[in-house]
């Protein structure tokens, strides 16, 4: 079950999704369940407006020369105590700047704060937060 929401209005867009997963396990192991949700608000700082892509079922790639600001939040609960799996609960807040060089390439600068807790994975701390800054050139296929 993964309901999605997409609203496009001029140079603003809102995306959100809830996801749920159930893994049937064999040999007497209990089924594993995980779930989460994310939300993204995006706006074109330079560029005219967003369009909908029927082929991609989402926001179309903005025009060449567009500069986009994206704010996002993600929550994922990969721990299922009934199944005996404590893979962690993650909260991630991020801010991204995308510059669309052409219709096939973009430059991206992204900051993310990620907090993970409630995990019991070998060689990993049970609680951790990470600040990440990344820059990349991305080819869109």
Model-assigned labels for residue ranges:
Residues 1-141:
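Outer-membrane beta-barrel pore domains
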């Amino acid at each position: 079950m993964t309901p999605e929401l997409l609203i496009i209005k001029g140079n603003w867009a809102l995306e959100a999704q809830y996801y749920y997963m159930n893994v049937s396990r064999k040999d007497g192991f209990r089924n594993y369940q995980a779930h989460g949700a994310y939300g993204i608000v995006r706006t074109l700082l330079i560029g005219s407006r967003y369009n909908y892509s029927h082929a991609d079922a989402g926001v179309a790639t903005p025009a060449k020369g567009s500069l986009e600001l994206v704010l996002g939040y993600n929550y994922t609960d990969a721990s299922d105590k009934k199944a005996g799996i404590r893979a962690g609960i993650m909260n991630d807040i991020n801010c991204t700047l995308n510059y669309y060089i052409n219709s096939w390439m973009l430059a991206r600068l992204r900051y993310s704060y990620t907090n993970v807790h409630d995990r019991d994975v070998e060689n990993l701390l049970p609680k951790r937060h990470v600040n990440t800054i990344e820059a990349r050139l991305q080819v869109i296929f």
